[in-house]
Amino acid sequence: MKKTKFFLLGLAALAMTACNKDNEAEPIVETDATVSFIIKSGEGRAVGDGLADAKITKLTAMVYAGQIQEGIKTVEEADGVLKVEGIPCKSGANRVLVVVANHNYELTGKSLNEVEALTTSLTAENQNAKNLIMTGKSAAFTIKPGSNHYGYPDGTTSDNLVSAGTPLAVTRVHAGISFAGVEVNMATQYQNYYSFNPADAKIAALVAKKDSKIFGNSLVSNTNAYLYGVQTPAGLYTPDAAGETYELEASLNTNYAVGAGFYVLESKYDASNELRPTILCIYGKLLDKDGNPLTEPALTDAINAGFCDGDGTTYYPVLVNYDGNGYIYSGAITQGQNKIVRNNHYKITLNITGPGTNTPENPQPVQANLNVTCQVTPWVVVNQAATW
């Protein structure tokens, strides 16, 4: 009889530890309620205009009472997660719903402060839109015993309908920077000497922030770690001061094409620290007027003038979302300039009117041979125009 009793208890324990397809964690506290919610992801697209927007394939939702995690549930769906249903939790006032999407964090049991202190680093995986972390946090609300539904439409059967018709907003931690187009219209004084072919060029991000917070009004980290996609001569913007690091990240370099660009992290251009602006640069061989590589003495003349480096490569850098250099902006720049902001897509249009520079991480003359226009529309998208 005693053996039979222990056997039945063992079966019960196994049943309690079984996982369902939604990866539902065991309730952290005694529960008398459930929360379900619908998400609203920011309108978006991948950096390339023609690419499909990435789906949320993994979403973890946590319910907090102060610092205490009272409930957690993770849902994974290859076709995209639009809602999370039936999070076991405890009723009470001043509860907060926190969500993290497309992530690899271990979140079970973490306090609210611990979750909000999480950071991420820019890696090659982030250049695929499906690997972009998204986060969201609700205002405080009351959970009642029974079923609670957040963001569901009016008329939903529920013991407590919260934020009816207004789903929980979930937004990307990353921003996008890209070239919407590059045209070459050499000014009269250069037409008989130089040309440039964007079709054979490459693009790279320079002085891109390596780390970022994933929660907060500003996600700019306190670290002084930066990444570059191509090594160029040091300039005023190059992170080389004490405590700064500057590393190669090969994924921040690709062939030029209309719409080509990169996902990057939030950054603030600190004037007291020589700006450290995130730069999007197109580069390639400076050519003669007939489209051929420069030969002597024209190559030496171009090198001495600072138009190209020793192998004839010229760079056309654009300081992304920078207020200056004659850049022209259109669209709703609602979050200010001189910084990179999450969930913004900075789309840059260039008009090249002359040779570039051999030091793209240096300030350029006001009358540089690059016209830049930049547009901001949802994602949010910032359209920026520049003329060299």
Swiss-Prot record:
It is found in: Fimbrium; Cell outer membrane. A lipid is attached at C19 (N-palmitoyl cysteine). The record marks R45, A46 as: Cleavage. Fimbriae are composed of a major, structural subunit (FimA) and the minor components FimC, FimD and FimE. Head-to-tail oligomerization of FimA molecules mediates assembly of the fimbrium stalk, while the minor components probably form the fimbrium tip. Linear, head-to-tail oligomerization of FimA is mediated by a conformation change, facilitating the insertion of a C-terminal beta-strand into a groove in the N-terminal domain of the following subunit. Belongs to the bacteroidetes fimbrillin superfamily. FimA/Mfa1 family. Structural subunit of the major fimbriae. These long, filamentous pili are attached to the cell surface; they mediate biofilm formation, adhesion onto host cells and onto other bacteria that are part of the oral microbiome. They play an important role in the invasion of periodontal tissues. Fimbriae and their constituents are major virulence factors. FimA proteins from different strains have highly divergent sequences, and this has been used for classification. The sequence-based classification correlates with pathogenicity. It holds the Pfam family FimA4_C. A lipid is attached at C19 (S-diacylglycerol cysteine). The keyword Signal applies. Synthesized as palmitoylated lipoprotein precursor. Efficient export to the outer membrane and integration into fimbriae requires lipidation and subsequent proteolytic removal of the lipidated propeptide. GO terms for cellular component: cell outer membrane; pilus. The name (major fimbrium subunit) does not indicate the abundance of the protein, but is derived from the greater length of the major fimbriae. In strain ATCC 33277 and strain 381, major fimbriae are 300 - 1600 nM in length and about 5 nm in diameter. In contrast, minor fimbriae are only about 80 - 120 nm long. This length difference is observed only in a small number of strains, including strain ATCC 33277 and strain 381, and is due to a loss of function mutation in FimB, a protein that restricts fimbrial length in other strains. Residues 19-45 form a propeptide. This is Major fimbrium subunit FimA type-4. Gene3D superfamilies: 2.60.40.3690. Residues 1-18 form the signal peptide. GO terms for biological process: cell adhesion. Keywords: Cell adhesion, Cell outer membrane, Fimbrium, Lipoprotein, Membrane, Palmitate, Signal, Virulence. One of its GO terms (molecular function) is structural molecule activity. Residues 379-388 are annotated as: Important for oligomerization and fimbrium assembly. InterPro entries: FimA_C (IPR053878), FimA_N (IPR029141), Fimbrillin (IPR008110). The keyword Signal applies.
